[in-house]
Amino acid sequence: MGDPAPARQSDFIFLVALRDPAGIFELVEVVGNGTYGQVYKGRHVKTGQLAAIKVMDVTEDEEEEIKQEINMLKKYSHHRNIATYYGAFIKKSPPGNDDQLWLVMEFCGAGSVTDLVKNTKGNALKEDCIAYICREILRGLAHLHAHKVIHRDIKGQNVLLTENAEVKLVDFGVSAQLDRTVGRRNTFIGTPYWMAPEVIACDENPDATYDYRSDIWSLGITAIEMAEGAPPLCDMHPMRALFLIPRNPPPRLKSKKWSKKFTDFIDTCLIKTYLSRPPTEQLLKFPFIRDQPTERQVRIQLKDHIDRSRKKRGEKEETEYEYSGSEEEDDSHGEEGEPSSIMNVPGESTLRREFLRLQQENKSNSEALKQQQQLQQQQQRDPEAHIKHLLHQRQRRIEEQKEERRRVEEQQRREREQRKLQEKEQQRRLEDMQALRREEERRQAEREQEYKRKQLEEQRQSERLQRQLQQEHAYLNSQKQQQQQQQQQQQQQQQQILPGDRKPLYHYGRGINPADKPAWAREVEERARMNKQQNSPLAKTKPSSAGPEPPIPQASPSPPGPLSQTPPMQRPVEPQEGPHKSLVAHRVPLKPYAAPVPRSQSLQDQPTRNLAAFPASHDPDPAAVPTPTATPSARGAVIRQNSDPTSEGPGPSPNPPSWVRPDNEAPPKVPQRTSSIATALNTSGAGGSRPAQAVRARPRSNSAWQIYLQRRAERGTPKPPGPPAQPPGPPNTSSNPDLRRSDPGWERSDSVLPASHGHLPQAGSLERNRNRVGASTKLDSSPVLSPGNKAKPEDHRSRPGRPADFVLLKERTLDEAPKPPKKAMDYSSSSEEVESSEDEEEEGDGEPSEGSRDTPGGRSDGDTDSVSTMVVHDVEEVSGTQPSYGGGTMVVQRTPEEERSLLLADSNGYTNLPDVVQPSHSPTENSQGQSPPTKDGGGDYQSRGLVKAPGKSSFTMFVDLGIYQPGGSGDTIPITALVGGEGGRLDQLQFDVRKGSVVNVNPTNTRAHSETPEIRKYKKRFNSEILCAALWGVNLLVGTENGLMLLDRSGQGKVYGLIGRRRFQQMDVLEGLNLLITISGKRNKLRVYYLSWLRNKILHNDPEVEKKQGWTTVGDMEGCGHYRVVKYERIKFLVIALKNSVEVYAWAPKPYHKFMAFKSFADLPHRPLLVDLTVEEGQRLKVIYGSSAGFHAVDVDSGNSYDIYIPVHIQSQITPHAIVFLPNTDGMEMLLCYEDEGVYVNTYGRIIKDVVLQWGEMPTSVAYICSNQIMGWGEKAIEIRSVETGHLDGVFMHKRAQRLKFLCERNDKVFFASVRSGGSSQVYFMTLNRNCIMNW
């Protein structure tokens, strides 16, 4: 390569062709992309001289093209205006991979003409420079055309400049040799903006041809590029440019500053009829080309300009120049969105310095050539001196080569050391991060251990308190039995059946010496005496006016007992509440339309005949129905007696108070609701389900009454008709909070309460009225079903949020006639919602619900409730297709051990809750300023695992039973869960647990094949309104009024702020293009953000990305109202609705890599509010847009606008919701949704179906989802309908009116947001599951 003659260099390289390039050439960096491979800057190893190396994979498909390119280069590159071909090499690859072909060509260090123009002030070259470059291009083309070769890709990027301002043509990848007989080509290859009209016509018309004069057109476009900085139509999408070039008149220079010779030259080159276009020989004689200053003068001027532009480019860019091919690459494989395609390689600055050094060596080499010529002349005069000189030169070259090798080795050694240092630094950072992670894990484990230890201590403390309570209750039971015996003997109202063989558990009677009694017994008697004084008839007749009772101090002479030894901080401190917050929860009247009990009325207000609704227990005597024991509800409500239990007499007072309902008074019925009549969901529970487990009960000891009944049953003696109702205690708070515990020693029998012979109120009404009914029950013992009336347990799969041992037992009402199913599409959503089943804290109201007022505040010493009860109303499936609406009732009870095990499961982070929010160990501040004891118990749903699976009870699901028949593998899902009013509270520890939140974004669904849609929500509250969202991988980008955030669904649910103080109205993620398309900012501009830039704002792992601008605008549009990304085959269109126009953009792949203008439609008759694009039958493009008047269409080719559908029956303006193109209609038919209607029309405005889709209410959002269905979000319900028929497939009723907004959907997940009145928002998502709700 040391020989300057190109032919001899080519021969030398050709002799060693197909050798491995190792040791001969090495690659430095990527400088561009050719047609069939990447172009590198390379270096000759021995001399250090630079070369351009094109690296191509040798495949069978491209073998012919590569051979053609090699032949072209070998034959026709020996011209001063064509880059010289040096040779070819084959780099072997491992087996299974393609070998690499290296084509080595002359390196042009000054870059391309396009680079030169971009680095010139004003993006325009001087006319003299343009004339010189055009002349050199014409000379190169004349050489090619003389050999019947068409270049076919003349443009600024393929015209390179050397250091000495020589002009070289490159990229023969699309060159073709003309056939000797035909002389014309009909293939379609080239770059759109520089392409001649006859070449474009070849794609549209197979009979069209062109010849070498197509290069003349490209030369004229390149001249305009040098004069104006860019070719004509460069802002248009390449496809649009291909359409316009043959149809538009030839382009002209915009400015008038250019000379007439230059203007005439361009007009001559850009003659549309190629047969009239002059050949290269004639153009070389054109005045603009011929009448030029001397070549030396122009080259000096151009060389100075190149040097200046290189300095500027060195400051701005990191590469010397860029080769670029004419390919349009596929953008489906994660392209980077940054405009530069230059790779960053280690040691880049070192390479740049080395490049400058090598360029200086090139200059010295040129001087050495002159010296060599002088030496040749001396050789003829003095041969001997010449030989000596040659030896000297040889020795010097050897020394220089050694020095060069030493420098290269030193440089490689420094690079290796630098890499090692970097690797060590990375390893050290990784070790530090791992150490920090381990330390954090250790601290977390310690915190968890400390938490568990404290929890166990408090549990032990609660167990001690429970043992004390057992002792107290045992003593109180004995006192009660004695009082009952005395009163029965005095009044003689009932038969004197005294249990002679029954002994009380404790025998501290009144005859015993008080000194012999223990301290706690004397204390209890003292309290009983004082409470008995308060139980006078006067006090009973005014329960609502009774104020809080001051605490009774213990007797001073009494020695400290077990109660007094309890630490003060561990004793329950309950606030005294007013009369309107009664301390006693009330019985759920399971009798049809039983009267709701006021909150201020105690349990004994209801006569015992209310129990007639329950079937008889296992006792053979059906008249003897034992009074139920105190059974708290599933929400932990504990029914406590506020007075001393010894004051409870055996029968009612002879003069009952006026507020006790007479026995003959008919109970008032619950008013029938006339709206929100919900149809029931029935599915079978046969296949794939596991056997139902019995509801567990852990009785510790029987109560005295139960012992008496059992012994009488064993002896066969008759039993009394039942204990009479007990007189009520005062409604105020007891003086001793420790006495407010239900007796843990009494029997807790788990039983199923069947429905009565009437009709229960509907599930939705019961759910909404649960606070008025007072769902917390107080039962002395749960009635046990007789063998004939026992409900059959039904198999079911365990659901999230329901422990595995909880089973729903359903009872069909035998006397009830089956009702026909009510069509779901006829539902009414206009009912007034009184109460919400969600906790008020989550609803943001800041006030406890009425159910929570039934208890005197929360406890701080642990939950010692004997039993927790959950009442669930469900429907029964009947054989055939006729469902029964008789209500079945399940009473689920839990013992304290179960409560503690469930609490431990929650606190240990088990993912058994159906909501995505799990309890956390890190306490946070109380929301809404509530104190911990008065937090509403809606959160206990979550902390106790009682969250309703579909939507945490904030949505109730209904479907049309006529549509979905019961499947063989589905489980029966309860329509709603009626959980008793908030009685007791969890202890302070559990409250702290559920204050924080750890988001489990991929909760494990324990149901094997769930076919029921579920609604869940994320705990995170956004302070501003959520306007839009888009899925980025599995994570969710959320756009609000105040910025852009990322919700990490793959991790712990953390929210990362990406962009602040900017409004985001609409967004879409195009991951394959590395883009996020948005309408954002105050002016509603269409901005495109690079995902790699957003990713770096979270990871901060690429400093180079941080320096770049992370977004760009599409055009200069402001006031964008809506856009739509439409993918057709491999083309991505972007349709944008502006104030009075619609713009159509299309994605242009590399080298453009941006959305470019395709078509514009201005001055539309209606302002577009909603826009979409369709391709009719794969041929015709039409823009469909909705306005306040109706729906309209614009033909893209002709620009004609016409109306599609105008709802003339609506006089006012309408709100268009969605344009849905029906599947399998070739883009011709669509569903247009507006207001609360939807019509089926085709793109020509013809009604295709005499069906009008009618929503149940005015939706705020309408969206088409993957399951070929359409969803509407209203304030009262979410409706799901078939997109092809408009038939209602399902409804999710809200528990309260709220504004919902569709965000995005993918596969079987639909994301939407709820917006509160204060502007705060939360994200919900609905999982449609595998079958997309088609198998409900």
Curated annotation (Swiss-Prot):
Where on the chain is Omega-N-methylarginine found, per UniProt?
Answer: R502, R510
Q: Which residues form the Protein kinase domain?
A: 25-289
Enumerate the spans annotated as CNH domain: 1023-1310
Q: Which cofactor does it need?
A: Mg(2+)
EC number(s) on file: 2.7.11.1
Q: Where is the composition biased (Acidic residues)?
A: 317-333, 832-848
Compositionally biased spans, kind Basic and acidic residues: 396-466, 519-529, 738-750, 808-825
InterPro entries, from UniProt? CNH_dom, Kinase-like_dom_sf, Prot_kinase_dom, Protein_kinase_ATP_BS, Ser/Thr_kinase_AS, STE20_Ser-Thr_kinase
| Pfam families in alphabetical order | CNH, Pkinase
An example Gene Ontology molecular-function term: protein serine/threonine kinase activity
Family affiliation: Belongs to the protein kinase superfamily. STE Ser/Thr protein kinase family. STE20 subfamily.
The protein in question is named Misshapen-like kinase 1
Q: Which organism is it from?
A: Rattus norvegicus
